[in-house]
A protein has these predicted regions:
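Sec-dependent signal peptide recognition
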Residues: 13-22
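Soluble extramembrane regions of membrane proteins in the secretory/endomembrane system
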Residues: 30-224
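Short, positively charged and aromatic/hydrophobic N-terminal segments
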Residues: 1-4, 8
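Intrinsically disordered, low-complexity sequence elements enriched in Ser/Thr/Gly/Pro
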Residues: 11-12, 147
């Protein structure tokens, strides 16, 4: 068999194309060794819209194959029923969820933080003050407080934390709110970090990592 000039060109192209395909696929192999963090930013009152945001974020994190979720949290609280739904979703989620208290995790925000597998806090931030109040700021009856106390205790137990500390956050007589240092002392904070990058760095340890932001995955339908 005598090769034509076309055959020679084709034979030469095959190893070149194979090499190009290898180079293109190389980042995919490299990415397998990366620890993937998926960041959900919750910087608002806890209500049905924030409940939908967190639920959607967890779904997107799972679709992205994330190893960890970072819940970047800054809230003074909100509706107890919405907080309970978020809490339940976090406890059900199969991969580890890291709460990053990016200034405030008050009231319902404290409950949500405690539902996460680990908690990191920013300098100057606080967690606690989970007494149930109405829209005017008046303390609700003991029936409502008892429900919140039970949720705080059970959530702390589910994530391996002291339930008495969680319950103290709902004490109407002497409500507990903690700084990062105070939270570390009682096992309610793993460390102080100034950014979500520092959080990922501490959690990943020696492994390389990448942070994916939920905002980058949001479609116009998601934002409705």
């Amino acid at each position: 068999y005598i090769c034509s000039s076309h055959d020679i060109i084709y034979i030469m192209k095959r190893p070149i194309l194979s090499f190009i395909a290898f180079l293109v696929s190389l980042p995919l192999f490299c990415n397998d060794s990366l620890t993937v963090f998926y960041r959900i930013r919750l910087d608002q009152d806890i209500d049905p819209s924030s409940q939908r945001l967190v639920t959607l974020g967890l779904e997107k994190a799972e679709q992205a194959g994330a190893d960890y979720v970072i819940l970047d949290l800054n809230t003074y609280g909100g509706a107890v029923n919405a907080a309970d739904s978020i809490r339940s979703a976090l406890l059900r989620y199969e991969k580890p969820v890291v709460a990053y208290v990016n200034m405030q995790a008050a009231s319902a925000g404290a409950l949500i933080s405690i539902a996460c597998d680990s908690i990191y806090m920013k300098t100057g931030s606080s967690i606690g003050a989970a007494t149930v109040v109405n829209q005017t700021g008046d303390v609700m009856p003991d029936k409502d407080q008892s429900f919140m106390r039970g949720m705080m205790r059970s959530t702390a137990q589910a994530t391996g934390r002291d339930p008495k500390i969680a319950e103290s956050m709902t004490d109407t007589a002497n409500v507990l709110s903690m700084t990062p240092t105070e939270a570390i002392e009682v096992g309610y904070c793993e460390g102080i970090c100034e950014s979500e990058y520092e959080v990922a760095e501490k959690v990943a340890g020696d492994k390389e990592f990448v942070i994916k932001n939920m905002e980058d995955d949001m479609t116009w339908l998601d934002k409705l």
